Regions:
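Glycine-rich, low-complexity intrinsically disordered segments
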Residues: 1-183
């Protein structure tokens, strides 16, 4: 029997150096103060809160031609494939107590766009897809990514219930490599 795919069979973590040292140092003391917290490094806290990743599909716009018979025919365009794919993806994260992971990532975004930062890209990001037995089926590497935006944070005084909420980070990447890992 062939099983249906499960949406949670993936592994995506930000690399250890994704949170700059300046930002990590700023939040480490707070994380160590949290009662019952086993996570002391900001990058581990961020990776813990990852809920999902959204990758746009691939779409090619056809070229329309209208021959003399009044019909329209469609053909493949001549634009190189790499220029037709929307090279961006989103990472969804759970909002944690005090919105601390939101503030860490906001500071990270501001760091990457500050004039003092000479590094044009973040480290490559890797997504691993697993099968039902936890075996790696394929890996996707987003090369030379840039953190582009962080979604808005909505606060509301009329709701005082702790509930599951998420926010998203948007990335653009320059190259996408797929590696099949089936032996």
């Amino acid at each position: 029997m062939i099983l249906n795919s499960r949406n949670n069979l993936f592994n995506f973590k930000f690399p250890r150096k994704f949170i700059p040292i300046e930002v990590a140092d700023k939040y480490r003391k707070y994380l160590n103060r949290m009662p019952g917290n086993l996570i002391t490094e900001p990058i581990d806290f961020i990776n813990y809160s990852i809920q999902g990743i959204a990758i746009p599909g691939i779409q090619f716009d056809p070229v329309e031609q209208a021959p003399n018979d009044g019909t329209i025919t469609y053909h493949r365009g001549s634009i190189p494939i790499q220029n037709t794919i929307e090279r961006q993806f989103q990472v969804e994260l759970q909002l944690l107590d005090g919105y601390i992971n939101y503030w860490i990532l906001q500071d990270t975004l501001l760091y990457y766009y500050s004039k003092s930062n000479r590094k044009p890209f973040t480290d490559d990001l890797k997504l691993q897809i697993l099968d039902a037995e936890g075996i790696h089926v394929m890996s996707a590497v987003f090369e030379k990514p840039i953190l582009n935006s962080i979604a808005e944070l909505e606060l509301n005084m009329s709701s005082n219930i702790a509930e599951f909420n998420t926010f998203t980070l948007n990335f653009y990447y320059n190259k996408f490599n797929l590696k099949l890992e089936i032996d």
